[in-house]
């Protein structure tokens, strides 16, 4: 990587650290969403840098659907223990009681109950007035038009027509009681930036991002990994061992892998240099209907 590229990453790093510090200084009760993925790992690393040698002055929150990959949960708990940050884990109790499952209820309803409603429950429970998220503008078209400080009303809903101008990187965090701001310090990063930064900073990631032989079935054009015995096979489906990795991580029945031999960070970066599709192509929830992500965000999803 040439010096110009390194400078570019340092500029992104400085911008993100500035945003994280601004939120910590401006809001009464911020929280950092921790989804365990690569973007969350970078955001956590930046937060640790922002307040080093002190501890991160706000908790991390994971909204657990009970359907995450087992390796993700193991990584989450190991990371929390290693760095000693406060980790809050919330599961929607109503969703658990009804046995909410992507197999039984479908991707759209499962995501709404276990993710969107679960998130809103947690934000209300703890009274957070700002919540960091790891979304980037290059991921998806609705995220491309979102502000760094994204205003949410008392119902946690997002109205893209009711947002504040952000001139010269000046952010408006004024909110009334019950309102909140979703904050996206990685807004201007690309997927390639994320991987190059992970490589340069030696950031730990969930092993699922690296290619390995894994049991998968092909369903709806996606390779779904069989992560536990809850995976229900449809007629004609056969479990195969393939060398795959994940560009994005979510609930395992709703997350597609890609065939790959990239089992190192440099291998992933080489793949990203020639990639022509978004990582969100591997998320079943983004294909529920046209404009699916924007609809979910309007309802309170990140």
Swiss-Prot record:
Catalytic reactions of this protein: sulfate + ATP + H(+) = adenosine 5'-phosphosulfate + diphosphate
UniProt keyword Transferase present: yes
Region (Disordered): 280-302
Entry's Gene Ontology molecular function annotations: ATP binding; sulfate adenylyltransferase (ATP) activity
Chain ranges passing through the membrane: none
Family: Belongs to the PAPS reductase family. CysD subfamily.
Function description: With CysN forms the ATP sulfurylase (ATPS) that catalyzes the adenylation of sulfate producing adenosine 5'-phosphosulfate (APS) and diphosphate, the first enzymatic step in sulfur assimilation pathway. APS synthesis involves the formation of a high-energy phosphoric-sulfuric acid anhydride bond driven by GTP hydrolysis by CysN coupled to ATP hydrolysis by CysD.
Known partners and oligomeric status: Heterodimer composed of CysD, the smaller subunit, and CysN.
HAMAP family hit by this protein: Sulf_adenylyltr_sub2 (MF_00064)
NCBIfam families: CysD (TIGR02039), PRK05253.1 (NF003587), PRK12563.1 (NF009214)
Protein name per its UniProtKB record: Sulfate adenylyltransferase subunit 2
Gene this chain is encoded by: cysD
């Amino acid at each position: 990587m040439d010096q110009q590229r390194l400078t570019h990453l340092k500029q992104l790093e400085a911008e993100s650290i500035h945003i994280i510090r601004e939120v910590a200084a401006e809001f009464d009760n911020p929280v950092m969403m921790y989804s365990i993925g690569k973007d969350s790992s970078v955001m956590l690393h930046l937060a640790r840098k922002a307040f080093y040698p002190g501890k991160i002055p706000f908790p991390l929150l994971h909204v657990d659907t009970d359907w995450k990959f087992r390796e993700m949960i193991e990584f989450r708990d190991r990371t929390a223990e290693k760095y000693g940050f406060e980790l809050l884990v919330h599961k929607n109790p109503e969703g658990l009681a009804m046995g909410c499952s992507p197999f039984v209820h479908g991707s759209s309803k499962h995501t709404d109950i276990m993710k969107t409603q679960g998130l809103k429950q947690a934000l209300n429970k703890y009274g957070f007035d700002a919540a960091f998220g790891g979304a980037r503008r290059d991921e998806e078209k609705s995220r491309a038009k979102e502000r760094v400080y994204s205003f949410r009303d008392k119902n946690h809903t997002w109205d893209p027509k009711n947002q504040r101008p952000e001139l010269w990187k000046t952010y408006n965090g004024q909110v009334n009681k019950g309102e909140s701001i979703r904050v996206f310090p990685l807004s201007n990063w690309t997927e390639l930036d994320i991987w190059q930064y992970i490589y340069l900073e030696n950031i730990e990631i969930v092993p699922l991002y690296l290619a390995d032989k894994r049991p998968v079935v092909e369903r709806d054009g996606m390779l779904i990994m069989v992560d536990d015995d809850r995976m229900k096979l449809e007629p004609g489906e056969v479990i195969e061992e393939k060398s795959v990795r994940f560009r994005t991580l979510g609930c395992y029945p709703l997350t597609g892998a890609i065939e790959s031999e990239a089992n190192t960070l440099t291998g992933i970066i080489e793949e990203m240099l020639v990639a022509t599709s978004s990582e969100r192509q591997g998320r079943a929830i983004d294909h529920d209907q046209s404009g699916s992500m924007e609809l979910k965000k309007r309802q309170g999803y990140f």
